[in-house]
């Protein structure tokens, strides 16, 4: 554990049951934690930083992360957290249950423009799992890889911690592999429950839609991560709600 991380955890303990808040700042001497005062009217439920604290942190160096805590709460960013994180364009570090959970500032899961290898179906799957607290590796994928003898999903899923489950056992957070104009599975979607999926197909924005007969016919298999648990979908749901509210 770094000195910065130790300082973050100590500050969170001192502030509890109120939420702590602060910044990780990169200075010429290295990264350091810059604690702030939570000026929220409901500090046990929310945090708010003063503009003066933000300015003082910026004067110390480059802000590389915003930090706050969820005392007695959940280890995922809330709906409000996600909305504010995207606006801040910063990584957010969340202290919960004595640990620091670090979240990259990924775009909202719905409403993304498609760009193969940058914001595509795998990016959406990877970012959704990141918000749920599970890290998936990124990897190079050339255009139309499925037309050039590659089978990237089936060749990599087990090695990254997923295992196949029966379609009849689908749970929110499971990954649907589909054959989209291909004889091999070349498309991933997140099953959201209630016959709904979240995915990103070419020439469309990422979105939720019904898991209709059309997509059921295209489905190759269903996969689940060994570290997945039902409550992890909270991190995904909070982002979807934040994007809906923002729109």
Regions found by a protein language model. Name each.
Residues 58-74, 205-206, 210-221:
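Extended, compositionally biased flexible segments
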Residues 92-120:
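Hydrophobic, well-structured mid-protein blocks that either form specific transmembrane helices
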Residues 142-206, 212:
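...with weaker cross-activation on analogous glycine-rich loops/strands in unrelated enzymes
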Residues 1-65, 71-103:
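Conserved beta-strand-loop surface patch within small alpha/beta domains used
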Residues 10-13, 109-116, 164:
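Short helix-to-loop capping/linker segments positioned immediately adjacent to catalytic or ligand/cofactor-binding
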Residues 209-247:
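Glycine- and charge-enriched low-complexity intrinsically disordered segments
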Residues 136-141:
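Surface-exposed patches in mature extracellular/periplasmic domains of secreted proteins
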Residues 115-132:
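Active-site nucleophilic cysteine motif
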């Amino acid at each position: 554990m770094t000195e910065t991380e130790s300082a973050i955890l100590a500050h969170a303990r001192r502030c509890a049951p109120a939420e702590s808040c602060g910044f990780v700042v990169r200075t010429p001497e290295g990264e350091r934690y810059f604690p702030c005062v939570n000026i929220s009217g409901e500090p046990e439920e929310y945090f708010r930083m003063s503009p003066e604290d933000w300015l003082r942190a910026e004067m110390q160096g480059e802000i590389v992360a915003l930090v706050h805590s969820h005392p007695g709460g959940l280890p995922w960013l809330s709906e409000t957290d996600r909305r504010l994180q995207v606006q801040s364009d910063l990584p957010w570090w969340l202290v919960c249950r004595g640990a620091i959970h670090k979240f990259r500032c990924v775009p909202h899961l719905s409403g993304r423009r498609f760009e193969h290898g940058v914001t595509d179906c795998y990016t959406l799957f990877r970012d959704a799992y990141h918000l749920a607290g599970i890290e998936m590796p990124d990897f190079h994928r050339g255009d139309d890889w499925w037309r050039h003898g590659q089978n990237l999903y089936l060749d990599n899923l087990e090695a990254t911690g997923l295992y196949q489950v029966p379609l009849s056992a689908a749970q929110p957070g499971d990954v649907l592999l589909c054959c989209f104009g291909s004889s091999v599975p070349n498309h991933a979607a997140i099953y959201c429950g209630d016959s709904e999926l979240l995915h990103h197909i070419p020439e469309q924005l990422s979105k939720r839609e019904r898991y209709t007969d059309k997509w059921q016919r295209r489905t190759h298999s269903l996969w689940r991560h060994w570290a997945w648990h039902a409550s992890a979908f909270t991190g995904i749901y909070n982002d979807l709600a934040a994007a809906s509210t923002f729109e």
